[in-house]
Amino acid sequence: MNGFSTEEDSREGPPAAPAAAPGYGQSCCLIADGERCVRPAGNASFSKRVQKSISQKKLKLDIDKSVRHLYICDFHKNFIQSVRNKRKRKASDDGGDSPEHDADIPEVDLFQLQVNTLRRYKRHYKLQTRPGFNKAQLAETVSRHFRNIPVNEKETLAYFIYMVKSNRSRLDQKSEGSKQLE
């Protein structure tokens, strides 16, 4: 059990899969269109939240009750995420089903940010929310606001290129200003 195999271990067969390693020798736990998925399971799990979103979207995915794990393959993980993002874009105020609309606004996944960062964003822009929002609600509110911020792209890119060419940033300017005061 110290990581080295002994002669006795080799007679007993291969070691059992560690319980903590997700997807080790396991296949996806989902049944798609009545057939069990045979792809290898990744580290994404089929949580209650994912299960709820799938049932709301009326997808033909179900969990196989005979398996003892909840890990899904990368294909189904990406499929579920893409369906979630497509539905969000289609539900936007201006129609959203034109191909131009999808190319104009890149999808930014703010769910990856920490709760403190989302709260700081909310405080900076003085967004009105109820107290006690959880991370998902906060990320949804912030992403709704983030998509509606007007940006002068030409000016922003010109400023960025200028700063890159001059090897300076606003932080450099602030530190130089404090040196001049001394």
UniProtKB/Swiss-Prot annotation:
Q: What is this protein called?
A: Histone deacetylase complex subunit SAP30L
Q: Where in the cell is it found?
A: Nucleus, Nucleolus
Tell me the subunit arrangement: Interacts with components of the histone deacetylase complex SIN3A, HDAC1 and HDAC2. Binds histones and nucleosomes. Interacts with FEZ1.
Q: Which sequence positions carry the modification called N-acetylmethionine?
A: M1
For this record, the Gene Ontology CC terms, alphabetical, are: fibrillar center; histone deacetylase complex; nucleolus; nucleus; Sin3-type complex
Sites where Phosphoserine occurs are at S92, S98
From the UniProt entry, list the residue stretches annotated as the region Important for DNA and phosphoinositide binding.
87-89
Query: Which N-terminal residues, if any, form the signal peptide?
Result: none
Q: Which UniProt keywords apply?
A: Acetylation, Disulfide bond, DNA-binding, Isopeptide bond, Lipid-binding, Metal-binding, Nucleus, Phosphoprotein, Repressor, Transcription, Transcription regulation, Ubl conjugation, Zinc, Zinc-finger
The processes (GO biological process) annotated in the record are:
negative regulation of cell migration; negative regulation of stem cell population maintenance; negative regulation of transcription by RNA polymerase II; negative regulation of transforming growth factor beta receptor signaling pathway; positive regulation of stem cell population maintenance
Q: Where is the composition biased (Acidic residues)?
A: 1-10
What is the annotated role of this protein in its UniProt record?
Functions as a transcription repressor, probably via its interaction with histone deacetylase complexes. Involved in the functional recruitment of the class 1 Sin3-histone deacetylase complex (HDAC) to the nucleolus. Binds DNA, apparently without sequence-specificity, and bends bound double-stranded DNA. Binds phosphoinositol phosphates (phosphoinositol 3-phosphate, phosphoinositol 4-phosphate and phosphoinositol 5-phosphate) via the same basic sequence motif that mediates DNA binding and nuclear import.
**Annotated source species:** Mus musculus
Locate residues linked as Glycyl lysine isopeptide (Lys-Gly) (interchain with G-Cter in SUMO2): K48, K154, K165, K174
Q: According to the UniProt entry, where does the motif Nuclear localization signal (NLS) sit in this chain? A: 85-90
Pfam families attached to this UniProt entry: SAP30_Sin3_bdg, zf-SAP30
Q: Which family does this protein fall into? A: Belongs to the SAP30 family.
Which Cys pairs does UniProt list as disulfide-bonded?
C28-C29, C37-C73
